[in-house]
Regions:
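Catalytic cores of eukaryotic secretory-pathway lumenal/extracellular enzymes that build
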Residues: 78-377
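Cysteine-centered metal-binding/redox modules
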Residues: 1-77
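Membrane-interface aromatic/basic loop that binds lipid-linked glycans or pyrophosphate carriers
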Residues: 395
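Aromatic-residue-lined binding/catalytic grooves and analogous aromatic/hydrophobic interfacial grooves
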Residues: 387-392
């Protein structure tokens, strides 16, 4: 059984408080009309884990009833968590924007004292960067000679293992990013509202780009909705040749949050339970990082969602950017090839029933049905190529 996105996504939905939803769902689970395999009600056919969260919903055999609507002000209070801490994980390679990025996220936070940074920073200026890190509250950096760690994912794992201290929420991003005002409280509020629909999840996307003018001033675009994922011709060709999915952003101006087939390396936001359940890997370097994270989160039962609202901006196409594969090809490409082989081996083993490198709450075949990416045949469905929302949430 599956839940179609259009069954769920209503921006005007009113929800009950979590305690009432949990009480309703516990009643449903004890009811003889409850189908345990699909979490549906035989009487109404609804998926009860979602229906029990809706304010206007009621049990078809009257075991629980609709609740009075919650005011927008009360709902905002419920979804806001002003005591929460956020850990920001950043890998950086010779990036002159790293400290501007850190300062921007501190300055724009509503609660900067609750923001914690863990940075793996590759740059020859080790003493300078260390001094910059200790100038700032809650900022820790592992300052390394370039080439010490090869790849974004191993660098993220290094930051996590050294610096993460059980913060409530987790923002994984790059060293060339900017934020909206009060990004911390806004993203937590949006995440908790979306969680009513998707349960535990990852917010992710290829966020809009910003630029810097010749005077060093940030140029932030007037874009308030995140792009969604689609596959360009080069992305399609790459998948056909390697079985490694890649995506490109497209501006579809969605009216709601959108189920995603993919995880962005430069932006994902989640809660601590997700990152503790699905840790980073040392086995992928760069290209395979995003599809592996998507598969790992998905097979662990964690949903992938692109939020409608923009919270952060990204500057990938910088004119002065340094790339390890250009500066250290002898070090990078052996690891790159090893990474590709690792990903391909995981796919082959998963198609033969193994969960090595993945998790067992959902299968790779569930992911194929969800995303339209057919590893088993090497084909791509039109819906994933065109960037339509992923098809359903498997139970």
């Amino acid at each position: 059984m599956s839940v179609k996105p259009w069954d769920l996504l209503n921006p005007n939905s009113q929800f009950v408080v979590p305690e009432i939803a949990e009480k309703r769902y516990s009643i449903c689970k004890e009811c003889p009309e409850f189908i345990k395999a699909t979490k549906q009600c035989k009487k109404c056919g609804c998926f009860m884990k979602f229906k029990t969260k809706l304010q206007a919903a009621e049990c078809p055999i009257f075991k629980w009833k609709a609740e009075d609507p919650i005011s927008n002000e009360e709902m905002e209070k419920i979804m806001t968590d002003n005591s929460a801490t956020i850990f920001i994980n950043i890998p950086s390679y010779k990036d002159p924007e790293i400290w501007k990025t850190v300062d921007n996220f501190i300055a724009n936070a509503e609660f900067p004292d609750r923001i914690y940074f863990g940075i793996t920073l590759h740059d020859e200026n080790i003493d300078y960067n260390y001094q910059e890190s200790i100038k700032r509250k809650n900022v820790q950096a592992d300052c390394l000679i370039p080439g010490t760690i090869i790849g974004c994912q191993p660098a993220r794992k290094n930051s996590h293992d050294k610096f993460y201290n059980n913060q409530d929420y987790y923002l994984n991003m790059d060293s060339h990013m900017r934020s909206i005002k009060n990004w911390d409280s806004e993203i937590i509020k949006a995440y908790n509202h979306a969680k009513n629909v998707y349960d535990i999840m990852v917010f992710t996307g290829y966020v809009p780009p910003y630029d810097v003018d010749t005077n060093g001033n940030d140029q932030i675009p007037d874009i308030d909705k995140n792009p969604t994922f689609f596959m360009s011709e080069s992305n399609i060709k790459h998948f056909k040749n390697t079985l490694v999915p890649q995506f490109t952003p497209q501006y579809t101006n969605p009216d709601t949050d959108v189920l995603s087939p993919y995880v962005s390396g430069h932006f994902f936001f989640t809660e601590k339970e997700a990152i503790q359940k699905v840790p980073f890997s040392n086995d992928v370097a760069f290209t395979e990082e995003e599809p592996l994270m998507a598969l790992r989160f998905f097979t662990a039962g964690i949903n992938l969602v692109t939020p409608q609202k923009v919270f952060v901006y990204h500057r990938y196409g910088r004119p002065d950017r340094k790339l390890i594969w250009e500066e250290m090809p002898d070090k990078f490409y052996p690891q790159h090839n090893k990474s590709k082989s690792y990903f391909q081996n995981i796919i082959v083993k998963a198609l033969n029933g193994s969960t090595d490198g993945l998790f067992d709450e959902r299968s790779i075949l569930d992911y194929e049905e969800y995303s339209g990416i057919r590893f088993s045949t090497g084909e791509l469905e039109d819906r994933v190529v065109k960037g339509l929302p992923s098809g359903f949430i498997p139970d």
